[in-house]
């Protein structure tokens, strides 16, 4: 299998990102901690295998914090997600960020396992946060993975420093 190539997103990727978000997230709008994001307008990286796009990550840097807003791999367990996180981690370090963080939902057990295995720690559970998010994005379902009610945002972080080897 050929190597996965990680490249920065460019303006030509915007339409693809919008379509990808609609197909995989049901909307091209993302809500995190009460903030609405449009991933097609954010910086990020795309993972390709030959000419096929197999992964996407978008992020937002505010001050010394870098938030991973979206991350997706169409090939689970292939190293795509890990490579995308490493790309964002590197850009965060180059930008002087001290914290890499993200939000997932209480139903997303696969994400919780994935992030913790890569050095992220759970730092907060924002109870009933999705009630607020649904006011900004009504299409967020009430029931998530495995029939679990979607209620809470779970915040994970990785503290960054120049010698970080996580």
Language model region names:
Residues 102-111, 127-135:
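Conserved beta-strand-loop-alpha-helix junction that forms the acyl-donor binding cleft
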Residues 1-12, 154, 158-166:
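Conserved N-terminal entry element of GNAT/NAT acetyltransferase domains
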Residues 78-90, 113-117:
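Conserved acetyl-CoA-binding loop-helix of GNAT-fold acetyltransferases
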Residues 8-76, 82-86, 159-160:
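Acetyl-CoA-dependent GNAT
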Residues 28, 32-39, 56-58, 76, ...:
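Conserved acyl-donor/pantetheine-binding loop and adjacent beta-alpha core of acyl/acetyltransferases
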Residues 92-104:
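Conserved GNAT acetyl-CoA-binding A-motif
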């Amino acid at each position: 299998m050929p190597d996965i190539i990680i490249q920065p997103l460019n303006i030509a990727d915007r339409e693809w990102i919008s379509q990808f978000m609609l197909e995989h997230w049901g909307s091209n709008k993302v809500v995190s901690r009460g903030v609405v994001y449009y991933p097609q307008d954010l910086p990020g990286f795309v993972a390709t295998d030959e000419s096929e796009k197999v992964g996407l990550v978008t992020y937002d840097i505010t001050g010394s914090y870098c938030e991973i807003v979206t991350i997706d791999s169409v090939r689970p367990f292939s190293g795509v997600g890990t490579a995308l996180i490493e790309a964002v981690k590197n850009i965060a370090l180059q930008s002087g960020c001290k914290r890499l963080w993200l939000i997932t939902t209480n139903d997303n057990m696969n994400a919780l396992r994935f992030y913790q295995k890569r050095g992220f720690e759970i730092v907060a559970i924002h109870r009933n946060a999705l009630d607020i998010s649904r006011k900004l994005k009504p299409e967020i379902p009430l029931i998530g993975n495995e029939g679990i009610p979607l209620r809470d945002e779970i915040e994970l972080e990785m503290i960054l420093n120049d010698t970080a080897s996580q």
